[in-house]
Amino acid sequence: MARYPLLATAVPDESLHQSLLDVLQSCQLEIIHDTADYVMAREKPSGIPYAQLVTVEGLIDKTGATQDQIRVEVVVKNEELPVHSDNHCSRVRDSVHKAFEASRQWSVAAG
């Protein structure tokens, strides 16, 4: 199973959760589970093998939140064995990383 973690941080405000949803949807991911502190999205089937379909989980870590920063742990994963470093899951991870960077609200570090 390929797993690629990201750590995103943002200034906590009312739009944080919606901003996380917007970032994931901008990567053509479909939101399949959404709670106050957890979001799961998946790649829409589009001609790629089932094992390569990517799931993205985002956990908003409110326990360590400060007035200035809140952490969101993001994991991009699929069932594909990562035989090559440039695989489908890693490309989706790169896309998610770039989407977070493009949003002025977020700061991202690779996990």
Give the label of every model feature segment:
Residues 1-111:
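Ser/Thr-rich, low-complexity intrinsically disordered terminal regions
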